[in-house]
Amino acid sequence: MYDINKVREDFPILSRTVYGKPLVYFDNGATTQKPLCVLDAMREEYLNVNANVHRGVHWMSQQATDLHEAARETVRKFINARSTTEIVFTRGTTE
């Protein structure tokens, strides 16, 4: 069983209160809140490897592509997919 308070600690925005109550966010179809590890990874990418994926021949583009494909492999393992070709990244749940 998950300790919901430990899970909430991973999401900085959920430390806020609204009208004196802990913030609860249910509009996940529009966007999802990100845990700190995701925010840290995004910050690192924007600071050090921000380039087009699969569209450039320069060093930074290759680095970005390698990281993108490594993320695809991580997701594949997490959901036990047979192949990375089964993993499709989109901008949102309704795309």
Tell me what each language-model feature is.
Residues 1-95:
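Pyridoxal 5′-phosphate
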